[in-house]
Amino acid sequence: KKQTGFTPFIGNGFSLDVPXSITEYGPXEKXEDNFDATNNLFV
């Protein structure tokens, strides 16, 4: 889980703007700390 003060731009991925925090998802970076369901999509 990554929380930054700005919207991260990652290639071949997409970023979610969440109030008070920014969560980014990418093919190379799975958000295992955020959602387990997201990991299931990449297995």
Curated annotation (Swiss-Prot):
Similarity comment: family membership: Belongs to the PsbP family.
Induction: By light.
Location within or outside the cell: Plastid, Chloroplast thylakoid membrane
Record's GO cellular component terms: chloroplast thylakoid membrane; photosystem II
GO biological process, one term: photosynthesis
Name listed for the protein in its UniProt record: Oxygen-evolving enhancer protein 2
Main localization category: plastid
Keyword annotations of the record: Chloroplast, Membrane, Photosynthesis, Photosystem II, Plastid, Thylakoid
Function: May be involved in the regulation of photosystem II.
Organism, scientific name: Physcomitrium patens (Spreading-leaved earth moss)
